[in-house]
């Protein structure tokens, strides 16, 4: 400061020198400020109008603001707050780390007002940068530079987000380093696979996957992990800890990434669109899995047969068929039917089995194994059991040999011999306890059970009609929208359902794969075959509720019911006179030809 004033005087500017303070006081205001900083705020700058130094303001004392100035008398140092301070300023002084006491002492002295056109040697601190550095939050006591801290906006913990992925960072430098990974410009690259990393430590951790190192074992089971964070995350499966709750519905999750994916269900956000169709997805993995429908890719292939799958869980479910067959070959004395419900049970993990059956008390390590086991209890009260599995039926096989069973999957109740099906009996692990029909997937069984219960959980928003499955609802909604997405490649005719297109294509190919077992007549669709078989069996399942007359086809019943209705049959489009009878009940229906 002294050198600056001397330089100004040499340039021709008139700047007064600081007056000498009395003997009891420090020699000048600058030394006084320096002693104040060295004593950590025990005394403040003493000044008054009587002996004011140039550039200093009045009313700055070592005592309280209301104490009178004692002039040249020595005053006892007291710990007092500076004038104009508010509660919390002392907290701010404690928060800021003092690196240069001399520089802070000089900042106490203001630049002379008549030299305001010159740059000040005491730069004003950037309050916004100071707020970012020390993360001042709303409600912080005190003020800084005349600005109330309670008015400052909160600063996000990680304000910088990556546009390529969903990760966020605290500063721009870390964000730029991360973005180099998307461009393949990481400073540390793995010599084995070429993957880039921002830090060498991350690359060394990654190399454990190539060497197969898993130094972190689980104390509850036999699993091992390459990172401690993965072990910590895995231990939550044993402890049941879910530390990440959803603020909207209260549902808790064991991983933060699962919480982020779940929160998109509340916001409706689907940031990943498909380039082939209009579908959007919440996760990138779901988009990749969906795109296999367009590309036809099936990356998961069975090692025991030639079948391949689009999803890994489909491959795991398919491999149960081979596992059941291998158990049968290894233990010929104890046959295990692959279509038995117990054949689909997943081996329980080592350790406790928390899922117990309420009927027999048997415990299981997986909840799905308990659900499969409980289906056995649903067969109670069915007196006619099966000799090969634990399923039962209400129908006596001796009295009705045509009753369909899981071990005769090629027949259907009341439908005669059916065509060969794509799913073999060895792949049917889920069976209906009501009719015994087998399914390859559990969700197919759940959808089939709605036929027996009459449940129709899917309602049309336009007409209110309800359906037992979502695909049926989607197909029905095309009747309102008029959409016909399935076009015939031969004639261009379009259909609302894929099954209707397949039935129509038989017209061009002349294919009639469904043959009648009685008269050997062939049909292009199974529905036509079932309708034809009513001639041989004499079945008339559609009866009129008013006259008890029965019909083999529903269309014949609808046409018959017009007789009982108020509206007469539509008149023929000709110039012939109307019939002689006038009573609608005397109308004779046209003959029916089979």
From Swiss-Prot:
Q: Which SMART domains match?
A: ZnF_C2H2
Please give an example of a GO cellular component term from this record.
nucleus
Membrane-spanning regions, if any?
none
Location comes to:
Nucleus
> What are the start and end residues of every segment in region (Interaction with STAT3)?
1-183
Zn-finger (C2H2-type) intervals are 160-182, 188-210, 216-238, 244-266, 272-294, 300-322, 355-377, 430-452, 458-480, 486-508, 514-536, 542-564
* InterPro entries (UniProt xref): C2H2-ZF_domain, Znf_C2H2_sf, Znf_C2H2_type
For this protein, the record's PROSITE patterns field holds: ZINC_FINGER_C2H2_1, ZINC_FINGER_C2H2_2
Output the Pfam families linked to this UniProt entry.
Answer: zf-C2H2
Q: What does this protein do?
A: Transcription factor that promotes adipocyte differentiation and suppresses osteoblast differentiation in the bone marrow. Enhances the osteoclast-supporting ability of stromal cells. Binds with STAT3 the consensus sequence 5'-CTTCTGGGAAGA-3' of the acute phase response element (APRE). Transactivates several promoters including FOS, OSM and PPARG. Recruits a histone deacetylase complex.
Where is the major localization of this protein?
A: nucleus
Annotated region described as Disordered, given as residue ranges: 1-86, 313-351
Q: Does the keyword Transcription apply?
A: yes
For this UniProt record, the keywords arranged alphabetically read as follows: DNA-binding, Isopeptide bond, Metal-binding, Nucleus, Repeat, Transcription, Transcription regulation, Ubl conjugation, Zinc, Zinc-finger
Q: Name one GO biological process term.
A: regulation of DNA-templated transcription
- Tell me which species this is from: Mus musculus (Mouse)
From start to end residue, where is composition biased (Polar residues)? 31-47
Subunit structure and binding partners? Interacts with STAT3. Enhances STAT3 activity by keeping it in the nucleus.
Covalent link Glycyl lysine isopeptide (Lys-Gly) (interchain with G-Cter in SUMO2), residues: 97, 368
Record-level Gene Ontology MF annotations = DNA binding; zinc ion binding
Residue stretches of biased makeup (Basic and acidic residues): 54-64
Family statement drawn from the similarity comment of this UniProt entry: Belongs to the krueppel C2H2-type zinc-finger protein family.
Specify the inducers: Down-regulated by CTF1, PTH and OSM.
Protein name in the entry: Zinc finger protein 467
């Amino acid at each position: 400061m002294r050198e600056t004033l001397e330089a100004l005087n040499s340039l021709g500017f008139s700047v007064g020198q600081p007056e000498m303070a009395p003997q009891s006081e420090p020699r000048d205001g600058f030394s006084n400020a320096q002693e104040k900083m060295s004593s950590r705020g025990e005394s403040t700058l003493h000044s008054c109008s009587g002996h004011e130094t140039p550039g200093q303001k009045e009313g700055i004392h070592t005592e309280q603001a209301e104490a009178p100035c004692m002039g040249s008398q020595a005053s006892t140092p007291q710990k007092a707050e500076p004038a104009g301070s508010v509660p919390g300023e002392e907290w701010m002084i404690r928060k800021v780390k003092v690196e240069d006491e001399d520089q802070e002492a000089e900042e106490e002295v203001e630049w002379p007002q008549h030299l305001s056109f010159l740059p000040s040697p005491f730069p004003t601190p950037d309050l916004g940068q100071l707020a970012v550095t020390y993360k001042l939050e709303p409600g912080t006591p005190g003020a800084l530079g005349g600005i109330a801290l309670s008015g400052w906006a909160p600063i996000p913990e990680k304000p910088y987000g990556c546009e390529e992925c969903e990760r966020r960072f605290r500063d721009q430098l870390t964000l730029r380093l991360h973005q180099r990974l998307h461009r393949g410009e990481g400073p540390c690259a793995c010599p084995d696979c070429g993957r880039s990393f921002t830090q060498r430590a991350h690359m060394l951790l990654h190399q454990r996957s190539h060497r197969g190192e898993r130094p972190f074992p689980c104390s509850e089971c036999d699993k091992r992990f390459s990172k401690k964070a993965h072990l910590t995350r895995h231990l939550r499966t044993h402890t049941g800890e879910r530390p990440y709750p959803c603020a909207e519905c209260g549902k808790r999750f064991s991983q933060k990434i699962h919480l982020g994916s779940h929160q998109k269900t509340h916001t409706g956000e689907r940031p990943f669109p498909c380039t082939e169709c209009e579908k959007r997805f919440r996760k990138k993995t779901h988009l990749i899995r969906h795109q296999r429908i367009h590309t036809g890719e099936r990356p998961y292939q069975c090692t025991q047969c030639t079948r391949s799958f689009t999803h890994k869980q489909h491959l795991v479910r398919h491999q149960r068929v081979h596992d059941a067959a291998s158990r049968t070959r290894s233990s010929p004395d104890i046959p295990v039917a692959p279509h038995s419900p117990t054949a689909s049970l997943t081996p329980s993990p080592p350790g406790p089995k928390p899922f117990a059956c309420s009927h027999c008390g048997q415990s299981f390590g997986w909840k799905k194994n308990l659900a499969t086991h409980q289906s056995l209890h649903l067969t109670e009260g069915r007196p006619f059991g099966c000799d090969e599995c634990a399923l039962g039926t209400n129908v006596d096989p001796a009295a009705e040999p045509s009753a369909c069973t899981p071990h005769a999957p090629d027949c259907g109740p009341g439908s005669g011999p059916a065509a060969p099906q794509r799913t073999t009996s060895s792949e049917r692990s889920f069976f209906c306890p009501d009719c015994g029909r087998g399914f390859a997937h559990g969700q197919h069984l759940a959808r089939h059970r709605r036929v027996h219960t009459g449940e129709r959980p899917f309602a049309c928003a336009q007409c209110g009609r309800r359906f037992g499955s979502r695909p049926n609802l989607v197909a029905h909604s095309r009747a309102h929208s008029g959409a016909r997405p399935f076009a015939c490649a031969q004639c261009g005719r379009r259909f609302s359902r894929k099954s209707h297109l397949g039935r129509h294509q038989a017209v061009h190919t002349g294919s009639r794969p469904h043959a009648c077992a009685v008269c050997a007549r062939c049909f292009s669709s199974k529905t036509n075959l079932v309708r034809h078989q009513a001639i041989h069996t004499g079945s008339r399942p559609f009866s009129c509720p008013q006259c008890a007359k029965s019909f083999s086809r529903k269309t014949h019943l609808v046409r018959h019911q017009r007789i009982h209705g108020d509206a007469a049959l539509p008149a023929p489009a000709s110039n012939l006179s109307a019939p002689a009878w006038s009573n609608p009940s005397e109308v004779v229906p046209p003959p029916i030809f089979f």
